[in-house]
Structures are given as structure tokens and as C-alpha cells.
Amino acid sequence: MTPEEALQRHWGYGTFKPLQREAVEAALAGRDCLVVLPTGGGKSLCYQLPAALGRGLVLVVSPLIALMDDQVAAAREAGLAADALHSNLEADHRSEAYRRLAAGQTDLLYVSPERLLVGDLLEDVAGRLILIAVDEAHCVSHWGHEVRPKYRRLAEILERFPKAARMALTATATPAVQEDVCAQLALRGPVRFIGHPDRPNLVYRAFPRRDQSAQVLEVVRRHPGEGGIVYVQTRKDVERLAAKLEGEGVSCAAYHAGLPAERRRRAQDDFVHERLDVVVATIAFGMGIDRSNVRYVVHANTPRSVEHYQQESGRAGRDGGPADCVLLFAASDLALHRALALKDGALAPERQRALERQLREIGRYAVAPVCRHRLLAEHFGAPYPAEGASRDGESCAACDVCLGETKSLSAEDALLTAKQVLSGAWRTGGRFGTGYVVNLLLGRGDERLTRNGHDSLQVFGLLKGSGEAAVRSWIDQLIVQGVLEVSEQREYPLLRITEAGKALCRDEGTVRLGVPAPPAARGRKRPKALRKGLASEMSPDEELFERLRQLRRLISERLGVPPYVVFHDSALVEMSALKPKTREALRGVKGVGDRKLERYGTAFLDVISGRPPESAASRSS
């Protein structure tokens, strides 16, 4: 069986995604390789397809224990002999997995790094092993955004299997991280398959954070009944924001490491099984999530690096449909990240420099009035637009800047505005906080300003026509660009002009400033974005699509697996557009392989022909 035949038979696709076939062929030829593909780019198929060809055992090392059982279920639905071994596995399931492994009946085995390092597993896999795939490989890198000590010990295990090919896979890796991954895993002359990091189906927006709850609610209301993730920095804010959304009638749950394990498990299961629309969480949530139809991700606080943002926002739109990624920025978030990193003492100089670089880069992404897609692509060392991509001039038409929701000031206006803001901090001697300087520039003569005589300064009311939101945003932008800084003195954050800021006031240097449009002009809901994006050249039947979703939910609940394991939304969209009447016609739908056709074909054809989902569900095996 050829790779193309296996792709059609097991997964129901006639063509590979970019770089998939090349990675599969390298693995089958015994070559070590590094695979960097964006989320939704089909990384898992790069190691699953070699397992489907039946030439030996493929071992997958993954830190995502919460996801393994769902990954095994999905692989089995594709007709693969798959198992998992991890610490959360029940004893009888573990024994059965070992029995099948010893009998040579397993083609694809998922293990956690902790389980692999125990040692007793190695003898069971040595004889048949053809490929070791290390998923989420950025976790091994000293420069990665999620360093995991157990991952850094994998090289010593890999050395015990010199005949097995090695494949390192990740969605998020700068050129420096790519080099480090290859070194840490001792990849031997690796072939590198580096996909373009851009996700054109994602609409990126970054706005100043003013009223966190109201701004989050604005996004949620644009997506009624659709799946979304809201990331918040602290546990307290998770609880507060989740309660606020619930009070507004939103189906949501809180998730953070301080909650009981059972409550966390229930929130995750309800979200993955589409019984829940929204999860409000710290970054503890998401690594074990494989819900492909997440329509939006909101960062209500700024993440600590561009790498974190790329990975977390990348959980949206994995089905290829359009999705919204919104970042609410405040410079105070960066200060908090810095404080948390230093809470246990000073960092080594190398790590301190890396931290400052990461904070500077995510700050620049959030405030620079530059195409967000371009900023992300260039951060990961990729040109933008990608070679062969169709773009209308320089506009991506998929971010707040290119959509005109954030306006860029001219160079002359930006310099003048920056000088006006800087003068407010300079004339007050750096002895007051941001709120005080904002009031000064807006001409709000409160008691403190009057008492200090600052209402008589020439800068008083200098920006009174600009509005508080714009002035606060400009202060944050100038902090990111290093011409203002916030320093702690007696636990009070004071706004000060830097030497670079003083130089700018002397016309030495340049600055870029943007101003967000009013909320009413931003991010209006597009009609049925999911269906439009997944079937741009089709005319899906909306009512039939919903009935097919209902059937999928009934089947998935009976089987105890997430809905995507049965069929992805993209397959349901195509079914609702093409309305196949025969099993052969249904087999032509992308994502309908032989096993799924056999198990679910009759039930889905029944619903397409008009049978109620409740009745048709009993016709699936």
C-alpha cells in the first residue's frame, strides 16, 4: 500500500497537506527529521501514516497526557492498532495495552516522557520499533517557551534505539529553538521540514485593555453558541470573569491549577465534547485540548512571549475555518511577568536577557500599528506573505491594522504625540503613576494635581481632545518602545521618561504610534463564518448541517469520545453541501475513510435523506 492509498483508506483524504508526504517518506527511509508545521497543519499524520503501513511500531512521546486517550480513539477510528501508556491509565487498560504490545499487535503507541524513562517499557518495544516521534518537541529546548526537564533526558533513551528513525515535531519554534531541538535530541543529519507559520484563517486583533469584562463579553457575544477560550493571568481573575460571563447567560466554566482535579476534568471534558461553549482559564488549560472548531481565543491579559501567544491563539480555527484571536494589552502585564520570573531571586544574566527580549517582543506585537500576521511570521523567521500566497497589496485583510480597526499615525504626528506624552512624565519628575499623568494630559484638575501645582504646567490639558483610551494606549506603546518606563518605588509604580525618551524629545530617534478605532467600528460578527470559511465554494444547507451535528453528538456521547473523533466539522459542512445519496458518494467526502464509512455511513446517509438524528443514531456501529 502506498502512502496515498493509506491516506485515502484510513483518513479519507485524496491529497496530503504541505510537507506531510515528504516527512512520511523521510521516516520510512529511516531518516531523522524535524517537522515544524502550524497548528492544523497535520503534524500527527506524519507519524501516524508510517504506523498505518504496518511496517513496524511507531512510538510517540508526548507531554499531553490529558489528550492521549482521545488521540488513541481517533487513531483507532482511522483503523490503526493504537494504544497509550501513561500514569492516568486504569490498571486493566494498562494490562491489556501491555498484552497487545507483547503480542506484536500494536502499531502506534503513545507514551509520556515520564513513562518512557521508567525503563521497563524499552524491552517490549525494541524489536519492532521503526520510528520514535517526539511531539511538542519545543519542550526539550533550553530556549523554548515551555522547558520540561523530563523532555531534556530523552536523548539518553533515544540512544538505545540506534536503528529507529527519530522525528521531532512542533508547531512553535524560532530558528534558535529549531537548532536546539536538533541538538538536544541528537538528531542525526536531520531533514528539516519547516512549514510557514502563518495561519491565514485567523483574524488577529490587539487592543488596549480598558474594561476587561466588557471587552471579553463583546467578543463572546459575537460568537453565540460557538466554542471559545478566554485566557486570564491570575486564578482570581479567572473566577471573577467566569462568574461575570455566567451571569450574562454564557455557557462557561473556570479552569486553573488551584481547582479540584475533578472539577478541572469535568470542565475540560464538557468543552471537548461541546457541552460547554467557553472556558475561562489560566495557561494551565489548553495543552490537552483537541477541539478543532474553537471559533475564538481571547487573551484578557498579555502572555509572556510571542511563542506562548502563537501556541495559545493557535488553538482557534484548527478546522480551517475563520476564527478570531483577540489580545487585550496593558503594560502592567509585562511588569507582572517580570516580577513573577524574579520572585525566587535574580535570574542568571543569560535568562534575564532572554526574559527581557521576550517581553519586548510580545509588547511590540501588541502595540505596533503593523500587520499582525507579518509580525508573527517574521518573528519565526519566515517571509510574509508566504511564497505563492494571494494578497491584496500589503493588506492581510485579517488583522485589526489591515482592517482599519487600528489606525497608524503619520511619522510626524507620532513624533509630536510622543513628545506631548513624554513631557507629561518629564514635567512631573517621574514621581507619579500612569493615572496621574493621564489626568494631567487630559486637563483633569483633581485635588492632587491642584495641590502639587501641576494644573498650572504648560502640559496640563495638552491632549484633552484625545480621550483617555488613546492617551493610556500611547503610554503603553511608549513603554514598549523604551522611551517611558514604570519603576517601583515603595511598592508604587511610577511613570518615568528614559534617556531614550529624552533623546526623542530632542528629535533624536523615531517612534511609531497607533490608535484603536471605537468599539462599535471593530470586529463585527460575520454571517456564519464557520460555514463560509470551511466551504467557500459550496452552499451548505444550514439546517442539515445542524442535524448532522446533532447526530454526531449522539454518536460521540454513546461512544464516550469527543465529536471530532467521529467527524470534523469540515466533513459535515461538505456533507450538508453535497448531500450524497450513496455510500460511494459519501466516501468522496474529505475525511470519510473506510472504517468511518463502515461504522457511520448508514446513519449519516439516513439523516441526509431526512431521517431524524435520534432515530438514525441507532444505525451506527
Language model region names:
Residues 1-6, 354-356, 386-621:
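Accessory DNA-binding and partner-docking regions appended to nucleic-acid-acting proteins
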Residues 1-10, 14-18, 22-34, 38-44, ...:
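Helicase motor core with emphasis on the C-terminal RecA-like subdomain
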Residues 22-26, 30, 361, 420, ...:
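Solvent-exposed, amphipathic alpha-helical segments
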Residues 25, 183, 311, 326-330, ...:
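Generic alpha-helical structural context detector
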Residues 27, 220, 271, 366, ...:
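Short helix-to-turn junction characteristic of helix-turn-helix DNA-binding domains
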Residues 350-385:
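Short, charged low-complexity linear segments at domain edges
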